[in-house]
Curated annotation (Swiss-Prot):
PANTHER family: CYSTEINE PROTEASE, CYSTEINE PROTEASE ATG4
GO molecular function, a single term: protein-phosphatidylethanolamide deconjugating activity
Active site feature: C160, D357, H359
Protein name: Cysteine protease ATG4A
Function: Cysteine protease that plays a key role in autophagy by mediating both proteolytic activation and delipidation of ATG8 family proteins. The protease activity is required for proteolytic activation of ATG8 family proteins: cleaves the C-terminal amino acid of ATG8 proteins to reveal a C-terminal glycine. Exposure of the glycine at the C-terminus is essential for ATG8 proteins conjugation to phosphatidylethanolamine (PE) and insertion to membranes, which is necessary for autophagy. In addition to the protease activity, also mediates delipidation of PE-conjugated ATG8 proteins.
Pfam families in UniProt: Peptidase_C54
Compartments it resides in: Cytoplasm
Bridged cysteine pairs (disulfide): none
The organism of origin for this protein: Oryza sativa subsp. indica (Rice)
Recorded catalytic activity of this chain's protein: [protein]-C-terminal L-amino acid-glycyl-phosphatidylethanolamide + H2O = [protein]-C-terminal L-amino acid-glycine + a 1,2-diacyl-sn-glycero-3-phosphoethanolamine
Assembly information from the UniProt record: Interacts with ATG8.
Length: 473
Protein backbone atom coordinates (compact mmCIF):
# COMPACT_ATOMS: atom_id res chain seq x y z
CA UNK A 1 0.00 0.00 0.00
CA UNK A 2 3.01 2.18 0.29
CA UNK A 3 4.99 3.47 -2.62
CA UNK A 4 7.67 1.20 -4.00
CA UNK A 5 10.96 3.09 -3.90
CA UNK A 6 13.10 3.34 -6.98
CA UNK A 7 15.70 5.34 -8.84
CA UNK A 8 15.14 7.24 -12.05
CA UNK A 9 17.13 6.67 -15.18
CA UNK A 10 17.83 9.01 -18.01
CA UNK A 11 17.67 7.64 -21.53
CA UNK A 12 20.39 9.73 -23.08
CA UNK A 13 23.69 11.21 -22.11
CA UNK A 14 27.29 11.05 -23.21
CA UNK A 15 28.60 11.93 -19.77
CA UNK A 16 31.22 9.42 -18.55
CA UNK A 17 29.34 8.91 -15.31
CA UNK A 18 26.34 7.80 -17.30
CA UNK A 19 28.48 5.07 -18.78
CA UNK A 20 29.19 3.59 -15.38
CA UNK A 21 32.63 5.06 -14.65
CA UNK A 22 33.92 5.19 -11.11
CA UNK A 23 32.38 7.66 -8.72
CA UNK A 24 34.50 10.51 -7.38
CA UNK A 25 36.57 9.48 -4.38
CA UNK A 26 36.53 11.14 -0.97
CA UNK A 27 39.77 12.93 -1.81
CA UNK A 28 38.28 14.76 -4.81
CA UNK A 29 38.33 18.51 -4.71
CA UNK A 30 35.17 20.50 -4.09
CA UNK A 31 35.16 21.63 -7.73
CA UNK A 32 35.44 18.05 -8.99
CA UNK A 33 32.64 17.02 -6.67
CA UNK A 34 30.40 19.82 -7.92
CA UNK A 35 31.09 18.87 -11.54
CA UNK A 36 30.39 15.22 -10.82
CA UNK A 37 27.11 16.06 -9.17
CA UNK A 38 26.10 18.28 -12.04
CA UNK A 39 27.03 15.58 -14.55
CA UNK A 40 25.01 12.83 -12.98
CA UNK A 41 22.03 15.07 -12.29
CA UNK A 42 22.03 16.30 -15.87
CA UNK A 43 22.14 12.68 -16.95
CA UNK A 44 19.12 11.80 -14.86
CA UNK A 45 16.98 14.80 -15.76
CA UNK A 46 18.04 15.55 -19.33
CA UNK A 47 15.13 13.71 -20.93
CA UNK A 48 11.34 13.61 -20.65
CA UNK A 49 11.60 9.84 -20.29
CA UNK A 50 12.73 8.01 -17.18
CA UNK A 51 13.47 4.56 -18.48
CA UNK A 52 13.66 2.41 -15.38
CA UNK A 53 13.17 2.55 -11.66
CA UNK A 54 13.96 -0.52 -9.62
CA UNK A 55 12.52 -1.70 -6.37
CA UNK A 56 15.11 -2.69 -3.81
CA UNK A 57 14.60 -4.35 -0.46
CA UNK A 58 13.33 -1.86 2.08
CA UNK A 59 16.54 -2.16 4.05
CA UNK A 60 18.36 -0.52 1.16
CA UNK A 61 16.26 2.60 1.57
CA UNK A 62 16.55 3.30 5.27
CA UNK A 63 17.45 6.89 6.09
CA UNK A 64 21.18 7.52 5.94
CA UNK A 65 23.09 9.15 8.74
CA UNK A 66 24.07 12.66 7.75
CA UNK A 67 27.39 13.03 5.97
CA UNK A 68 28.93 16.07 4.41
CA UNK A 69 31.14 16.87 1.46
CA UNK A 70 32.48 14.44 -1.06
CA UNK A 71 32.37 11.48 1.32
CA UNK A 72 28.58 11.46 1.40
CA UNK A 73 28.33 11.75 -2.38
CA UNK A 74 30.88 8.99 -2.94
CA UNK A 75 29.08 6.79 -0.45
CA UNK A 76 25.81 7.35 -2.32
CA UNK A 77 27.34 6.42 -5.68
CA UNK A 78 29.16 3.39 -4.28
CA UNK A 79 25.90 2.18 -2.79
CA UNK A 80 24.17 2.45 -6.17
CA UNK A 81 26.99 0.54 -7.86
CA UNK A 82 27.00 -2.16 -5.19
CA UNK A 83 23.26 -2.73 -5.46
CA UNK A 84 23.46 -3.17 -9.21
CA UNK A 85 21.62 0.07 -9.91
CA UNK A 86 24.27 2.02 -11.80
CA UNK A 87 22.84 0.82 -15.11
CA UNK A 88 19.84 3.00 -14.46
CA UNK A 89 21.92 6.04 -15.32
CA UNK A 90 22.79 4.73 -18.79
CA UNK A 91 21.61 6.31 -22.04
CA UNK A 92 18.59 5.38 -24.11
CA UNK A 93 20.67 3.19 -26.41
CA UNK A 94 21.56 0.95 -23.50
CA UNK A 95 19.57 -1.66 -21.59
CA UNK A 96 20.03 -3.68 -18.43
CA UNK A 97 20.85 -6.76 -20.51
CA UNK A 98 20.64 -7.78 -24.15
CA UNK A 99 17.69 -10.03 -23.30
CA UNK A 100 14.32 -9.52 -24.89
CA UNK A 101 11.66 -7.52 -23.10
CA UNK A 102 8.23 -9.07 -23.35
CA UNK A 103 5.53 -6.47 -22.78
CA UNK A 104 1.87 -7.46 -22.99
CA UNK A 105 2.51 -10.01 -25.71
CA UNK A 106 5.01 -7.95 -27.74
CA UNK A 107 8.76 -8.49 -27.82
CA UNK A 108 11.28 -5.64 -27.76
CA UNK A 109 15.05 -5.83 -28.16
CA UNK A 110 16.46 -2.95 -26.11
CA UNK A 111 20.12 -3.61 -26.80
CA UNK A 112 21.57 -1.40 -29.55
CA UNK A 113 24.37 -3.90 -30.08
CA UNK A 114 22.34 -7.05 -30.60
CA UNK A 115 19.28 -6.53 -32.79
CA UNK A 116 17.02 -9.46 -33.49
CA UNK A 117 16.10 -10.53 -37.00
CA UNK A 118 12.98 -12.19 -35.67
CA UNK A 119 9.73 -10.77 -36.98
CA UNK A 120 8.32 -11.28 -33.47
CA UNK A 121 10.64 -8.67 -31.98
CA UNK A 122 10.70 -4.90 -32.36
CA UNK A 123 13.99 -3.10 -31.92
CA UNK A 124 14.75 0.02 -29.99
CA UNK A 125 14.04 1.68 -26.71
CA UNK A 126 11.94 4.36 -28.37
CA UNK A 127 9.38 1.82 -29.60
CA UNK A 128 9.18 0.19 -26.18
CA UNK A 129 8.83 3.50 -24.35
CA UNK A 130 6.12 4.65 -26.75
CA UNK A 131 4.23 1.44 -26.08
CA UNK A 132 4.75 1.62 -22.32
CA UNK A 133 3.75 5.28 -22.02
CA UNK A 134 0.60 4.62 -24.07
CA UNK A 135 -0.74 2.16 -21.50
CA UNK A 136 -3.43 3.49 -19.18
CA UNK A 137 -1.93 4.36 -15.78
CA UNK A 138 -4.38 4.62 -12.88
CA UNK A 139 -3.16 5.76 -9.48
CA UNK A 140 -4.26 6.88 -6.06
CA UNK A 141 -6.51 9.93 -6.31
CA UNK A 142 -7.61 12.51 -3.79
CA UNK A 143 -10.42 15.03 -3.75
CA UNK A 144 -13.20 12.91 -5.24
CA UNK A 145 -16.75 12.60 -3.88
CA UNK A 146 -17.03 10.50 -0.74
CA UNK A 147 -17.32 6.77 -1.38
CA UNK A 148 -20.82 5.56 -0.56
CA UNK A 149 -21.68 6.35 3.05
CA UNK A 150 -18.04 6.57 4.13
CA UNK A 151 -16.04 9.75 4.58
CA UNK A 152 -13.27 8.63 2.24
CA UNK A 153 -12.47 11.16 -0.49
CA UNK A 154 -9.13 9.52 -1.29
CA UNK A 155 -7.87 5.95 -1.67
CA UNK A 156 -4.29 6.71 -0.58
CA UNK A 157 -2.66 3.80 1.28
CA UNK A 158 -5.42 1.27 0.63
CA UNK A 159 -6.68 1.41 -2.97
CA UNK A 160 -3.69 0.01 -4.87
CA UNK A 161 -5.31 -3.35 -5.71
CA UNK A 162 -8.40 -1.59 -7.06
CA UNK A 163 -6.22 0.74 -9.15
CA UNK A 164 -4.09 -2.13 -10.45
CA UNK A 165 -7.20 -4.00 -11.53
CA UNK A 166 -8.55 -0.89 -13.24
CA UNK A 167 -5.31 -0.67 -15.24
CA UNK A 168 -5.59 -4.27 -16.41
CA UNK A 169 -9.23 -3.92 -17.46
CA UNK A 170 -8.49 -0.57 -19.13
CA UNK A 171 -5.84 -2.26 -21.30
CA UNK A 172 -8.41 -4.88 -22.31
CA UNK A 173 -10.77 -2.12 -23.43
CA UNK A 174 -7.98 -0.32 -25.30
CA UNK A 175 -7.03 -3.54 -27.10
CA UNK A 176 -10.67 -4.22 -27.94
CA UNK A 177 -11.64 -0.77 -29.23
CA UNK A 178 -8.32 0.50 -30.60
CA UNK A 179 -6.11 -2.57 -31.09
CA UNK A 180 -2.82 -3.71 -29.58
CA UNK A 181 -0.83 -1.45 -31.91
CA UNK A 182 -2.58 1.72 -30.72
CA UNK A 183 -0.33 4.43 -29.30
CA UNK A 184 -1.41 7.63 -27.59
CA UNK A 185 -1.52 10.40 -30.23
CA UNK A 186 0.70 13.42 -29.74
CA UNK A 187 -1.98 15.75 -31.08
CA UNK A 188 -5.55 16.51 -30.08
CA UNK A 189 -8.40 15.95 -30.62
CA UNK A 190 -8.27 12.39 -29.29
CA UNK A 191 -10.48 9.59 -30.51
CA UNK A 192 -13.91 9.15 -28.88
CA UNK A 193 -13.02 5.55 -28.00
CA UNK A 194 -9.93 6.58 -26.02
CA UNK A 195 -11.69 9.38 -24.15
CA UNK A 196 -14.70 7.16 -23.52
CA UNK A 197 -12.51 4.52 -21.88
CA UNK A 198 -10.87 7.06 -19.57
CA UNK A 199 -14.29 8.45 -18.65
CA UNK A 200 -15.45 5.02 -17.47
CA UNK A 201 -12.60 4.91 -14.93
CA UNK A 202 -13.31 8.33 -13.43
CA UNK A 203 -13.73 8.68 -9.69
CA UNK A 204 -17.47 9.07 -9.24
CA UNK A 205 -20.54 6.87 -9.12
CA UNK A 206 -21.50 8.21 -12.55
CA UNK A 207 -18.47 6.46 -14.08
CA UNK A 208 -19.12 2.79 -14.81
CA UNK A 209 -15.86 1.32 -13.50
CA UNK A 210 -15.00 3.82 -10.78
CA UNK A 211 -13.53 2.86 -7.44
CA UNK A 212 -16.91 3.80 -5.95
CA UNK A 213 -18.79 1.23 -8.03
CA UNK A 214 -16.15 -1.48 -7.66
CA UNK A 215 -16.29 -1.26 -3.87
CA UNK A 216 -20.07 -1.42 -3.96
CA UNK A 217 -20.01 -4.47 -6.25
CA UNK A 218 -17.42 -6.23 -4.10
CA UNK A 219 -19.05 -5.80 -0.70
CA UNK A 220 -19.84 -9.49 -0.40
CA UNK A 221 -16.16 -10.27 -1.02
CA UNK A 222 -14.86 -7.93 1.65
CA UNK A 223 -14.25 -4.80 -0.42
CA UNK A 224 -14.69 -1.64 1.62
CA UNK A 225 -13.30 1.88 1.62
CA UNK A 226 -10.17 2.00 3.75
CA UNK A 227 -9.47 -1.75 3.54
CA UNK A 228 -6.98 -3.63 1.39
CA UNK A 229 -8.24 -6.52 -0.71
CA UNK A 230 -6.70 -9.55 -2.40
CA UNK A 231 -6.64 -10.46 -6.11
CA UNK A 232 -9.33 -13.14 -5.92
CA UNK A 233 -11.89 -10.86 -4.28
CA UNK A 234 -10.96 -8.12 -6.76
CA UNK A 235 -11.65 -10.41 -9.72
CA UNK A 236 -15.01 -11.40 -8.28
CA UNK A 237 -15.89 -7.76 -7.70
CA UNK A 238 -15.27 -7.10 -11.40
CA UNK A 239 -17.46 -10.07 -12.30
CA UNK A 240 -20.30 -8.69 -10.19
CA UNK A 241 -19.89 -5.12 -11.44
CA UNK A 242 -19.81 -6.12 -15.11
CA UNK A 243 -22.91 -8.28 -14.72
CA UNK A 244 -24.80 -5.58 -12.81
CA UNK A 245 -23.71 -2.89 -15.23
CA UNK A 246 -24.80 -4.92 -18.24
CA UNK A 247 -28.20 -5.71 -16.71
CA UNK A 248 -28.77 -2.04 -15.92
CA UNK A 249 -27.84 -0.77 -19.36
CA UNK A 250 -29.78 -3.47 -21.16
CA UNK A 251 -32.84 -2.50 -19.15
CA UNK A 252 -32.37 1.16 -20.08
CA UNK A 253 -31.21 1.16 -23.70
CA UNK A 254 -30.77 -2.45 -24.71
CA UNK A 255 -26.98 -2.25 -24.70
CA UNK A 256 -24.25 -2.93 -22.18
CA UNK A 257 -21.09 -0.84 -22.08
CA UNK A 258 -18.67 -3.70 -21.30
CA UNK A 259 -18.03 -5.11 -24.78
CA UNK A 260 -16.88 -8.60 -23.86
CA UNK A 261 -17.72 -11.63 -21.76
CA UNK A 262 -15.86 -11.97 -18.46
CA UNK A 263 -14.63 -15.32 -17.15
CA UNK A 264 -13.08 -15.59 -13.68
CA UNK A 265 -11.20 -18.90 -13.79
CA UNK A 266 -10.82 -20.89 -10.57
CA UNK A 267 -11.21 -24.39 -9.19
CA UNK A 268 -10.00 -27.68 -10.65
CA UNK A 269 -11.91 -30.12 -12.80
CA UNK A 270 -13.57 -31.85 -9.81
CA UNK A 271 -13.70 -28.87 -7.50
CA UNK A 272 -11.35 -30.65 -5.09
CA UNK A 273 -8.41 -29.12 -3.30
CA UNK A 274 -4.90 -29.33 -4.70
CA UNK A 275 -5.51 -28.83 -8.41
CA UNK A 276 -4.73 -25.94 -10.71
CA UNK A 277 -7.54 -23.67 -11.95
CA UNK A 278 -9.18 -24.93 -15.12
CA UNK A 279 -10.04 -22.88 -18.18
CA UNK A 280 -13.15 -24.73 -19.32
CA UNK A 281 -13.85 -24.29 -23.02
CA UNK A 282 -17.53 -25.10 -22.58
CA UNK A 283 -17.88 -22.48 -19.85
CA UNK A 284 -16.20 -19.87 -22.04
CA UNK A 285 -18.52 -20.77 -24.92
CA UNK A 286 -21.58 -20.47 -22.66
CA UNK A 287 -20.44 -17.08 -21.38
CA UNK A 288 -20.02 -15.86 -24.94
CA UNK A 289 -23.45 -17.21 -25.84
CA UNK A 290 -25.01 -15.41 -22.88
CA UNK A 291 -23.17 -12.22 -23.80
CA UNK A 292 -24.63 -12.48 -27.31
CA UNK A 293 -28.14 -13.02 -25.88
CA UNK A 294 -28.40 -16.65 -26.85
CA UNK A 295 -26.68 -16.47 -30.21
CA UNK A 296 -24.08 -19.14 -30.84
CA UNK A 297 -21.49 -16.73 -32.22
CA UNK A 298 -18.32 -16.24 -30.21
CA UNK A 299 -17.76 -12.92 -28.47
CA UNK A 300 -14.62 -11.22 -27.20
CA UNK A 301 -13.77 -12.53 -23.74
CA UNK A 302 -11.67 -11.34 -20.80
CA UNK A 303 -10.18 -14.09 -18.63
CA UNK A 304 -9.02 -13.40 -15.08
CA UNK A 305 -7.10 -16.20 -13.36
CA UNK A 306 -6.51 -15.62 -9.60
CA UNK A 307 -3.75 -17.78 -8.12
CA UNK A 308 -1.82 -18.36 -4.91
CA UNK A 309 1.60 -19.67 -5.93
CA UNK A 310 3.14 -20.30 -2.53
CA UNK A 311 2.78 -19.40 1.12
CA UNK A 312 5.05 -16.62 2.32
CA UNK A 313 6.85 -16.25 -0.99
CA UNK A 314 6.50 -17.19 -4.63
CA UNK A 315 7.37 -20.82 -5.29
CA UNK A 316 10.33 -20.61 -7.73
CA UNK A 317 8.98 -23.47 -9.84
CA UNK A 318 6.32 -21.09 -11.18
CA UNK A 319 8.71 -18.31 -12.26
CA UNK A 320 9.43 -19.67 -15.79
CA UNK A 321 5.71 -20.22 -16.34
CA UNK A 322 4.76 -16.72 -15.24
CA UNK A 323 7.43 -15.27 -17.52
CA UNK A 324 6.08 -17.16 -20.50
CA UNK A 325 2.54 -15.82 -20.06
CA UNK A 326 3.84 -12.41 -21.15
CA UNK A 327 4.70 -13.92 -24.55
CA UNK A 328 1.04 -14.78 -25.20
CA UNK A 329 -0.49 -12.33 -27.72
CA UNK A 330 -3.52 -12.32 -25.42
CA UNK A 331 -1.49 -11.17 -22.38
CA UNK A 332 -2.94 -8.44 -20.16
CA UNK A 333 -0.32 -8.81 -17.44
CA UNK A 334 -0.62 -9.54 -13.75
CA UNK A 335 -2.19 -8.00 -10.67
CA UNK A 336 0.58 -8.39 -8.14
CA UNK A 337 3.50 -6.86 -6.31
CA UNK A 338 5.16 -6.92 -2.94
CA UNK A 339 2.95 -8.09 -0.06
CA UNK A 340 0.44 -5.34 0.66
CA UNK A 341 1.59 -3.24 -2.31
CA UNK A 342 -0.28 -4.18 -5.45
CA UNK A 343 1.04 -3.07 -8.84
CA UNK A 344 0.14 -3.72 -12.46
CA UNK A 345 2.85 -6.01 -13.85
CA UNK A 346 2.88 -5.62 -17.62
CA UNK A 347 6.22 -6.99 -18.80
CA UNK A 348 9.29 -9.05 -18.04
CA UNK A 349 13.01 -9.05 -18.83
CA UNK A 350 15.12 -11.95 -17.60
CA UNK A 351 13.93 -12.55 -14.02
CA UNK A 352 12.65 -9.03 -13.43
CA UNK A 353 9.13 -7.80 -13.99
CA UNK A 354 8.26 -4.36 -15.37
CA UNK A 355 5.28 -2.64 -13.85
CA UNK A 356 3.12 0.47 -13.60
CA UNK A 357 2.87 1.70 -10.04
CA UNK A 358 -0.45 3.02 -8.69
CA UNK A 359 1.17 4.47 -5.56
CA UNK A 360 1.41 8.04 -6.79
CA UNK A 361 -1.16 10.46 -5.41
CA UNK A 362 -2.87 12.67 -7.98
CA UNK A 363 -5.86 14.97 -7.84
CA UNK A 364 -9.13 13.50 -9.06
CA UNK A 365 -10.01 14.61 -12.58
CA UNK A 366 -13.28 14.53 -14.46
CA UNK A 367 -12.89 13.57 -18.11
CA UNK A 368 -16.22 13.97 -19.87
CA UNK A 369 -17.01 11.30 -22.43
CA UNK A 370 -17.38 13.89 -25.20
CA UNK A 371 -14.36 16.06 -24.34
CA UNK A 372 -11.90 15.09 -27.07
CA UNK A 373 -9.57 17.93 -26.01
CA UNK A 374 -9.23 16.70 -22.42
CA UNK A 375 -5.91 16.70 -20.58
CA UNK A 376 -5.17 13.00 -20.17
CA UNK A 377 -1.57 13.30 -19.00
CA UNK A 378 -2.35 11.99 -15.51
CA UNK A 379 -3.40 8.68 -17.06
CA UNK A 380 -0.02 7.94 -18.62
CA UNK A 381 3.44 7.31 -17.19
CA UNK A 382 6.86 7.19 -18.84
CA UNK A 383 8.69 5.75 -15.83
CA UNK A 384 9.29 2.01 -16.07
CA UNK A 385 9.84 0.35 -12.71
CA UNK A 386 11.21 -3.14 -12.26
CA UNK A 387 11.22 -5.74 -9.51
CA UNK A 388 12.78 -9.17 -9.11
CA UNK A 389 10.16 -11.71 -10.09
CA UNK A 390 10.82 -13.88 -7.06
CA UNK A 391 9.91 -10.97 -4.77
CA UNK A 392 6.33 -10.59 -5.95
CA UNK A 393 3.53 -11.70 -3.67
CA UNK A 394 2.38 -15.28 -4.39
CA UNK A 395 -1.23 -14.03 -4.38
CA UNK A 396 -1.82 -12.65 -7.86
CA UNK A 397 -4.15 -12.75 -10.84
CA UNK A 398 -3.29 -13.12 -14.53
CA UNK A 399 -5.37 -11.50 -17.28
CA UNK A 400 -5.91 -12.44 -20.93
CA UNK A 401 -8.03 -10.88 -23.68
CA UNK A 402 -9.24 -12.99 -26.60
CA UNK A 403 -10.83 -11.05 -29.44
CA UNK A 404 -12.61 -13.94 -31.18
CA UNK A 405 -12.82 -17.73 -31.39
CA UNK A 406 -9.55 -18.07 -33.30
CA UNK A 407 -7.80 -15.93 -30.70
CA UNK A 408 -9.28 -18.01 -27.88
CA UNK A 409 -8.21 -21.24 -29.60
CA UNK A 410 -4.68 -19.85 -29.95
CA UNK A 411 -4.69 -18.96 -26.25
CA UNK A 412 -5.82 -22.49 -25.32
CA UNK A 413 -3.09 -23.99 -27.51
CA UNK A 414 -0.40 -21.86 -25.88
CA UNK A 415 -1.76 -22.58 -22.40
CA UNK A 416 -1.73 -26.33 -23.10
CA UNK A 417 1.88 -26.11 -24.25
CA UNK A 418 2.67 -24.28 -21.03
CA UNK A 419 1.09 -27.12 -19.05
CA UNK A 420 3.42 -29.56 -20.80
CA UNK A 421 6.40 -27.52 -19.59
CA UNK A 422 5.17 -27.34 -16.00
CA UNK A 423 6.55 -30.67 -14.73
CA UNK A 424 3.30 -31.48 -13.01
CA UNK A 425 2.75 -28.04 -11.46
CA UNK A 426 0.92 -25.86 -14.01
CA UNK A 427 -0.38 -22.36 -13.33
CA UNK A 428 -3.71 -23.44 -14.81
CA UNK A 429 -4.99 -26.06 -17.22
CA UNK A 430 -7.38 -26.16 -20.17
CA UNK A 431 -10.21 -28.67 -20.53
CA UNK A 432 -13.23 -29.02 -22.76
CA UNK A 433 -15.70 -29.45 -19.90
CA UNK A 434 -15.91 -29.82 -16.13
CA UNK A 435 -18.31 -31.65 -13.88
CA UNK A 436 -20.23 -29.82 -11.14
CA UNK A 437 -19.24 -30.91 -7.66
CA UNK A 438 -20.79 -30.80 -4.25
CA UNK A 439 -20.65 -27.67 -2.13
CA UNK A 440 -17.62 -27.72 0.14
CA UNK A 441 -17.56 -24.29 1.75
CA UNK A 442 -20.14 -21.66 2.50
CA UNK A 443 -19.96 -18.40 0.57
CA UNK A 444 -19.96 -16.54 3.88
CA UNK A 445 -16.48 -17.91 4.56
CA UNK A 446 -15.04 -15.71 1.83
CA UNK A 447 -13.15 -12.56 2.70
CA UNK A 448 -11.14 -9.91 0.92
CA UNK A 449 -7.74 -10.95 2.23
CA UNK A 450 -6.62 -12.73 -0.91
CA UNK A 451 -7.00 -16.20 0.68
CA UNK A 452 -10.72 -16.70 0.01
CA UNK A 453 -12.26 -20.17 0.04
CA UNK A 454 -15.41 -20.22 -2.07
CA UNK A 455 -18.04 -22.77 -3.11
CA UNK A 456 -17.78 -24.98 -6.17
CA UNK A 457 -21.17 -25.17 -7.86
CA UNK A 458 -20.61 -25.51 -11.60
CA UNK A 459 -22.60 -23.19 -13.82
CA UNK A 460 -25.31 -20.89 -12.54
CA UNK A 461 -28.36 -19.72 -14.42
CA UNK A 462 -26.50 -16.93 -16.19
CA UNK A 463 -23.97 -19.31 -17.70
CA UNK A 464 -21.23 -18.08 -15.35
CA UNK A 465 -19.35 -20.36 -13.05
CA UNK A 466 -20.52 -20.47 -9.47
CA UNK A 467 -18.32 -19.40 -6.59
CA UNK A 468 -15.44 -21.83 -6.93
CA UNK A 469 -12.71 -22.88 -4.60
CA UNK A 470 -9.45 -20.97 -4.76
CA UNK A 471 -6.52 -23.02 -3.52
CA UNK A 472 -2.82 -22.66 -2.84
CA UNK A 473 -0.86 -24.38 -5.59
Amino acid sequence: MTSLPGRGVSPSSSDPLCEGNAAPSSSSSGQDLKQSKNSILSCVFSSPFSIFEAHQDSSAHRPLKPHSGSYAWSRFLRRIACTGSMWRFLGASKALTSSDVWFLGKCYKLSSEELSNSSDCESGNAAFLEDFSSRIWITYRKGFDAISDSKYTSDVNWGCMVRSSQMLVAQALIFHHLGRSWRKPSQKPYSPEYIGILHMFGDSEACAFSIHNLLQAGKSYGLAAGSWVGPYAMCRAWQTLVRTNREHHEAVDGNGNFPMALYVVSGDEDGERGGAPVVCIDVAAQLCCDFNKGQSTWSPILLLVPLVLGLDKLNPRYIPLLKETFTFPQSLGILGGKPGTSTYVAGVQDDRVLYLDPHEVQLAVDIAADNLEADTSSYHCSTVRDLALDLIDPSLAIGFYCRDKDDFDDFCSRASELVDKANGAPLFTVMQSVQPSKQMYNEESSSGDGMDIINVEGLDGSGETGEEEWQIL
